[in-house]
Structure formats: structure tokens, C-alpha cells
From Swiss-Prot:
GO terms for molecular function: rRNA (pseudouridine-N3-)-methyltransferase activity. It comes from the Bacteria. It catalyses: pseudouridine(1915) in 23S rRNA + S-adenosyl-L-methionine = N(3)-methylpseudouridine(1915) in 23S rRNA + S-adenosyl-L-homocysteine + H(+). Homodimer. Pfam families: SPOUT_MTase (PF02590). Belongs to the RNA methyltransferase RlmH family. It is found in: Cytoplasm. S-adenosyl-L-methionine binds at L73, G104, L123, S124, D125, L126, T127, L128. InterPro entries: Alpha/beta_knot_MTases (IPR029028), RlmH-like (IPR003742), tRNA_m1G_MTases_N (IPR029026). It comes from Leptothrix cholodnii (strain ATCC 51168 / LMG 8142 / SP-6). This is Ribosomal RNA large subunit methyltransferase H.
Amino acid sequence: MKLLLIAVGQRLPAWADTAYEDYAKRFPPDLRLELKAVKTEARTTGKPVEALMAAEKTRIEAALPRGCRRVVLDEHGQRVTTAQLAERLAVWQRDGRDVALLVGGPDGLDQTLRDGADEKLRLSDLTLPHAFVRVMLAEALYRAWTLSIGHPYHRE
């Protein structure tokens, strides 16, 4: 099973790429974390926000594996603790489908992507820069996985 972080935005600071990769490489071969960064639609075109998000939606959909579970990261999503995320991860693993975690661009995700999600999760009550989101999500997933296997990385 793969965990696919599909995020709008390609250029992030080097520290964010390094931190993300540090967590991604810790996952076992049967539970890989993979990043698919899709291009942000240029905000200088004068197009309405809905058109910009629709263009990004098309790119996100092209990156989605067939039959995957879609999990939207959204400010209105459900709050989860590390233990709850570990439980979700175990459910996802039993299900066997790849899991796509979707992170929108500067204006968020197109409404049809949000409506079509299997799950909606909230990473934080704060508005976070995209670089932080990638790193925090990778760390949270790694922490959840270590909790589920009894690894000492996570401590209560």
C-alpha cells in the first residue's frame, strides 16, 4: 500500500524537501510515503479563483491512482489525535487500497474534490504554509505508524 501526498505547489524551500524526505524514507517497503507535487495555476492570469482551483483539480485527478481512498486535508475536516490517526492508518492498511492525501493550493481545493472525498481531516486549527503541511503530515503519518507497531518513537 502507498500513502500518496498529492499537493498543489512544486517549489518549496530546500529545508522542507529535506525534512519531508527524512520522514518518507523511514516507512517500510509495504507502506511507502510518496509525494506527487502538482503545478499551481498562475495567479496572475486574472481568472476567477474557481477557475484556478478547477485547473488544479484536473492536475490532482490526473495524479490519483485508480480506486484509491481519497483523504482531503481541509480546515473544516475532522480533528484527529495521533492515536486516532494510527487507528485510521490500520484501517487503511487492512483495506489495502492506496491512500491519496490531498492538499490544495493557495485557495484550497476545488469543491468537487472536497465533496468526493472518502474522508476529510484537519491537520491543525492554524493556517499553515504548504512547506509545513508536507513536513507535518509526513511526521504525523510516521508517528501514527510507529504507534501502531509499538515502536518507541511515540511516547504518551
